[in-house]
C-alpha cells in the first residue's frame, strides 16, 4: 500500500507504446481516483499543464468532463473504498520516448463508486509539450492497493 507508484525504468528508447493494466484497485479515500503524471528527463511534471477529455457512463446517464490545465491525467475514476468496490481498467501511452512529439494517453475503467453505483469511464489525455518522457507516476490522495502491470509495445 502506497499513495504513489513510480515506474522509472520504462525503456522509452525501446517501446513506442506503453500499456498499463489495473486489476482490483482499491483506494483508501472514498471517491478518490488513480491519477497519472509523467517524468520528463527524470523529473516529475506536476504543473497544471496536462489536458484531458472524459466521458462517464453510470446508471444515472452520461456526463463529460475536460480540462486544459490539470496537474495530472486520469486513469481510474472515483471508486469506493468498501468491500467489492474495486476498480479495473487500462491505459495506453503513446510517444513517451520521442522528444519531438507530445505524449498522449487513452484510458478506460470500470468501478463501483461510493454510493455504490456502477461506473464506466473512458477518455484521453495529453502532455502538450514535446519532451522526453522516461517514467510514469500513478498516485492517489490515499493508499493504493491492487495489481498494476506495465507492458511495452514496440513498432517494427
PLM region spans:
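Surface-exposed molecular-recognition determinants
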Residues: 1-156
Amino acid at each position: 500500500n502506497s499513495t504513489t507508484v513510480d515506474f522509472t525504468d520504462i525503456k522509452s528508447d525501446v517501446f513506442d507504446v506503453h500499456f498499463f493494466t489495473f486489476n482490483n484497485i482499491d483506494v483508501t479515500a472514498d471517491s478518490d481516483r488513480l491519477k497519472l503524471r509523467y517524468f520528463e528527463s527524470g523529473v516529475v511534471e506536476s504543473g497544471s499543464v496536462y489536458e484531458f477529455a472524459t466521458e462517464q457512463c453510470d446508471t444515472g446517464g452520461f456526463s463529460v468532463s475536460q480540462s486544459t490545465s490539470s496537474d495530472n491525467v486520469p486513469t481510474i475514476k472515483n471508486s469506493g473504498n468498501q468491500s467489492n468496490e474495486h476498480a479495473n481498467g487500462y491505459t495506453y501511452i503513446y510517444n513517451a520516448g520521442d522528444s519531438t512529439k507530445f505524449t498522449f494517453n487513452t484510458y478506460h475503467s470500470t468501478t463501483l463508486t461510493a454510493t455504490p453505483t456502477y461506473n464506466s469511464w473512458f477518455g484521453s489525455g495529453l502532455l502538450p509539450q514535446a519532451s522526453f518522457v522516461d517514467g510514469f507516476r500513478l498516485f492517489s490522495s490515499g493508499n493504493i492497493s491492487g495489481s498494476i502491470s506495465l507492458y511495452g509495445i514496440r513498432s517494427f
